[in-house]
Structures are given as C-alpha cells and as structure tokens.
C-alpha cells in the first residue's frame, strides 16, 4: 500500500530511443512489472559535466527481455547501452501534511522550495475503493454560494464539470471553493494542473499565495511543454495525495483538475507512440478505460470524500467529441460560467439555465429546495424568452403580467450574485456565506413580490436577506 524506500531489483540496458519512447533490455528472469519506474542516468545538456536521472515508466512487455517505456522527462543526452535500474515500484509521490503549500511535478519533486522529503510516499497507481467501502447515501455538499447550492447543488464525493472561457471568473471560483473547504469544512484541497500553460500555473500560485489559501492546498503540475507521459500521470499523482487525506487523515478533500481534456489528449499521444490502432477521431482505443481508472478513484468512502471539480475544454465546441463525451458520463453536476452574465458584472457568473445537477431532484434534496429552484429557473426562462421582444419593441410593449415577470426576474438574476472571500483584496468587501435554507426563503420571497419595492441595485452582490435590507436602506428604501 505504501512505499517509503526504493529497492533496486534489476539492471538493464537501453536498446532504442525514439523521442519519449525508450526500449530497455533486461535479463529474462528479472523483467520489471508493468508501470514500474525505471531510472537511468544521462549527461545533463544544461550543465556540462553533470548527470541527471531520467524516470521511465514500463508501458509494454515486447518479449525476449525487451520492455517499452515512456519517459517522464525529455530524453536529450540518452544513448544506447546506458544502464537502467528497476526501482521495483511504480512512480511514487509524497503524501500527508508535507504536501500542503508545496508545488510538485509528476514525480513528486518539490518545485517551489528547496526541501528534501524522506517521509511516506504512495504509488500513483492504486485501485479504486472496494464496493463495500463506498458511502451508500447521496449527500449534498453545501458551499454557501447561493447560485450553486440552490440551482446546481454539488454532491459530496461527486464530480463537477466546470465550463468557462478566459476571463469569466473560473480561477476565482476555484480559489473560493478551496477557501470554503478549508474554512467551512476544515478540509484540504489538491490542485492538478494537467497540460495547461505554465504562465497560468504560475499566475494561480501567485494568486493563491495572495489570497491565503495555498497553505491548505497541495499543487501538482505537468504543463503543456512536458512529455506526454508526464501529462498523462499528473492527475494520478494529485489524486494519490488526495486519497491519503481522505483515507488516512479522514478529511473531506476538494480535488481540482485543470484541464481534464489535456489528460485525454496526453493519453492519445502516448497511445500513438506505443503503436496502438487509433479509435474514433484519432483518440486512443482505451479512452473509456483510462478515464474510468481515474474517475472511479474519485469517490466517497464511509464518512469522508473526495469531491472533484474538473475544468473541461470542449474542442471546437463539439460536445459529441469523444473526449468531453466520455467525461460527461462520469459527472454529477455541470457549472457553466457565462460571458454575457459576467459582462453584467454578476459574479460568480454561473449560467442558471445551462448548469445542471444530478441531485436537483426531490429524491435527493428537500421538496422546498426543489420547488424554489424550479420557480427560479421558470422565471429566468420566461425572462430569456421575452428578451427578443424587448430588444425589438421595448419593454413598454409587454403586457402587465410579462412586465411583472421581467421586473422580478431581473431582481432574481442580480440576487444570484455574491461577494467572494478571495476577491476581498480587490473589492474591499467581505465575502458572504449564505445557508441553503436562507437562500430558499429569500428567492421565494423575491418571486412572490415581497421585495418589489426595493430597487434593482439593492439585490446586486449581496448575501442573504439581511444584506438585501441593508443595501435597500442605504439606497433610501426600507
């Protein structure tokens, strides 16, 4: 289950190098197991006269003592006949409190501080929890964010897809969730940066340091410029750290993957390098299997959970593409961040009509919660249907009933906005946590017309009912 010391069990020789694919010859009676990590020393091109250690992962047994491996680093300087050592175990990463506030690569090496680690390490290749270890009941994960809790409730131990382009508030929402898990649930977060831009990873680390959430977070990065083997394994490395917090420290964990599409893309590259026949649209034939091995480990065990938020890039906006389509099969909720909503200054810019949740159903949530969510969605949908008429003829041409719908829908839309804790350094305004019961009461009251006399501005960026009344009082209405 755990590995603390690497033990060399066999030595082989490099037989062939083709880019990140390295064939290694071993004695037939000392073959390394599948997914074992192999080490080979090569000359470091960046530092003349110095050596560096490459890590290779066994991907195929070719027969006659030959194994095909994928390198986790660039293979510059690697030559045939170089000695290769089998570590006797898979790639391992540090686990436990040491990981908090640290930035790691796929191999578990610390990147942001010069600190050695001699403690416990776990292999990144692990089995999903057994069926009898799983939490049988479906439980809502309350965040304190009105629009999420009311309209797209998250499942404890579930998987949430996060859709959003650049500049619509995705990073702020991710940081806010990390903050709320740490402060409201006394939990910890793990962030896996899979195949994204190095600049974005650096920006995230800086912003998390500024907002004070990095000390409750472990970060693992395998960025866009790294070999496909690294990008394929980085999500597993992050998930292994999260599993330790769940299984050993008995904590609730929030696990972020940015971007899950890059995980699939890396798998496709590795599959091609290994000579497998491509499947639909050029993807790997084992796409569903690879995705399942990752997603099935993200779950609730008895009393503790890993809840996952996964940023999803949709190639060419085609939801039927095999990569996003395979991911959708595993999701419990989708949170869609909308540019038109963010342009109105409404944050979090969650689209209440496009976002969905599996548990927005009376079987899983209270009837009053379901009824309130349906009322909000109905009034917003009516408002959306009327917008074309308003744009062409103007609001004065609507009937009295439709005018009332628009009047209340605009207030509901603004009341879905909320100040966040992590944005306080920019806005100067404290974030708010709104209990679900208060959200239900407030939205029912707005739709029933109890606050029709309040100006629209009073509903903007406020928390619960008391905040709303305070805003209205400042605007001269009571």
Swiss-Prot record:
Class in the EC hierarchy, top level: translocase
Keywords: ATP synthesis, ATP-binding, Cell membrane, CF(1), Hydrogen ion transport, Ion transport, Membrane, Nucleotide-binding, Translocase, Transport
CDD domains for this protein: ATP-synt_F1_beta_C (cd18110), ATP-synt_F1_beta_N (cd18115), F1-ATPase_beta_CD (cd01133)
Main location: membrane
Organism superkingdom: Bacteria
GO MF annotation list: ATP binding; ATP hydrolysis activity; proton-transporting ATP synthase activity, rotational mechanism
Catalytic activity reported: ATP + H2O + 4 H(+)(in) = ADP + phosphate + 5 H(+)(out)
Pfam families noted in UniProt: ATP-synt_ab (PF00006), ATP-synt_ab_N (PF02874), ATP-synt_VA_C (PF22919)
InterPro entries (alphabetical): AAA+_ATPase, ATP-synt_VA_C, ATP_synth_F1_bsu, ATPase_a/bsu_AS, ATPase_alpha/beta_chains, ATPase_F1/V1/A1_a/bsu_N, ATPase_F1/V1/A1_a/bsu_N_sf, ATPase_F1/V1/A1_a/bsu_nucl-bd
UniProt feature coiled coil, ranges: none
Subcellular location: Cell membrane
Its EC number(s): 7.1.2.2
Membrane topology per record: Peripheral membrane protein
GO cellular component: plasma membrane; proton-transporting ATP synthase complex
Binding site for ATP: 164-171
Family designation: Belongs to the ATPase alpha/beta chains family.
Described purpose of this protein according to its UniProt entry: Produces ATP from ADP in the presence of a proton gradient across the membrane. The catalytic sites are hosted primarily by the beta subunits.
Subunit structure of this chain's protein: F-type ATPases have 2 components, CF(1) - the catalytic core - and CF(0) - the membrane proton channel. CF(1) has five subunits: alpha(3), beta(3), gamma(1), delta(1), epsilon(1). CF(0) has three main subunits: a(1), b(2) and c(9-12). The alpha and beta chains form an alternating ring which encloses part of the gamma chain. CF(1) is attached to CF(0) by a central stalk formed by the gamma and epsilon chains, while a peripheral stalk is formed by the delta and b chains.
Protein name (record): ATP synthase subunit beta
The organism of origin for this protein: Streptomyces avermitilis (strain ATCC 31267 / DSM 46492 / JCM 5070 / NBRC 14893 / NCIMB 12804 / NRRL 8165 / MA-4680)
Organism classification: Bacteria, Bacillati, Actinomycetota, Actinomycetes, Kitasatosporales
Gene designation: atpD
């Amino acid at each position: 289950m755990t590995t603390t010391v690497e033990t060399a069990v066999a030595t082989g020789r490099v037989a062939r190098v083709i880019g990140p694919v390295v064939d290694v010859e071993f004695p037939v009676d000392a073959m390394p197991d599948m997914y074992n990590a192999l080490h080979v020393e090569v000359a470091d091109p960046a530092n003349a006269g110095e050596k560096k250690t490459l890590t290779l992962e066994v991907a195929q047994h070719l027969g006659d003592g030959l194994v095909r491996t994928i390198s986790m680093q660039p293979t510059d300087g690697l030559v045939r006949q170089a000695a290769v050592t089998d570590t006797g175990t898979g790639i391992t990463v540090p686990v436990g409190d040491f990981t908090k506030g640290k930035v790691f690569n796929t191999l578990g090496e610390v990147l942001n501080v010069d600190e050695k680690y001699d403690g416990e390490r776990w292999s990144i290749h692990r089995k999903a929890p057994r069926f009898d270890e799983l939490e049988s009941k479906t439980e809502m994960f309350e965040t304190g964010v009105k629009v999420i809790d009311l309209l797209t409730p998250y499942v404890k131990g579930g998987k949430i897809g996060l859709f959003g382009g650049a500049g619509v508030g995705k990073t702020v929402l991710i940081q806010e969730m990390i903050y709320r898990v740490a402060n409201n649930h006394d939990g910890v977060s793990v962030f896996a940066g899979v195949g994204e831009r190095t600049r974005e990873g650096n920006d995230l680390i800086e912003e998390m340091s500024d907002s004070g959430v990095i000390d409750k977070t472990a970060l693992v990065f395998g960025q866009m410029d790294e070999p496909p083997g690294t990008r394929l394994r980085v999500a597993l490395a992050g998930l292994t750290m999260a599993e330790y917090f769940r299984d050993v420290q008995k904590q609730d964990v929030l696990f972020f993957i940015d971007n899950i599409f890059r995980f699939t893309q890396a798998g496709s590259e590795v599959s091609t390098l290994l000579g497998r026949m491509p499947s639909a649209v050029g993807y790997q034939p084992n796409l569903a299997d690879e995705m399942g091995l990752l997603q099935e480990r993200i779950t609730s065990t008895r009393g503790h959970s890993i809840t996952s938020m996964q940023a999803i890039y949709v190639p060419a906006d085609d939801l039927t593409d095999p990569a996003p389509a395979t991911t959708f099969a595993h999701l419990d909720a989708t949170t869609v961040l909308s540019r038109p909503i963010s342009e109105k200054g409404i944050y979090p810019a969650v689209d209440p009509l496009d976002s969905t949740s599996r548990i927005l159903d009376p079987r899983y949530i209270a009837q009053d919660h379901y009824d309130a969510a349906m009322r909000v969605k109905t009034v917003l949908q009516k408002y959306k249907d009327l917008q074309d008429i308003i744009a062409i003829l103007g609001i004065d041409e609507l009937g009295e009933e439709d005018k009332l719908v628009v009047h209340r829908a605009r207030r509901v839309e603004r009341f879905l906005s909320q100040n966040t804790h992590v944005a306080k350094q920019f806005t100067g305004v404290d974030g708010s946590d709104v209990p679900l019961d208060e959200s239900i009461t407030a939205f029912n009251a707005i739709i029933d017309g109890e606050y029709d006399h309040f100006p629209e501005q009073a509903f903007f960026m406020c928390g619960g009912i008391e905040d709303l009344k305070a805003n209205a009082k400042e605007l001269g209405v009571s």
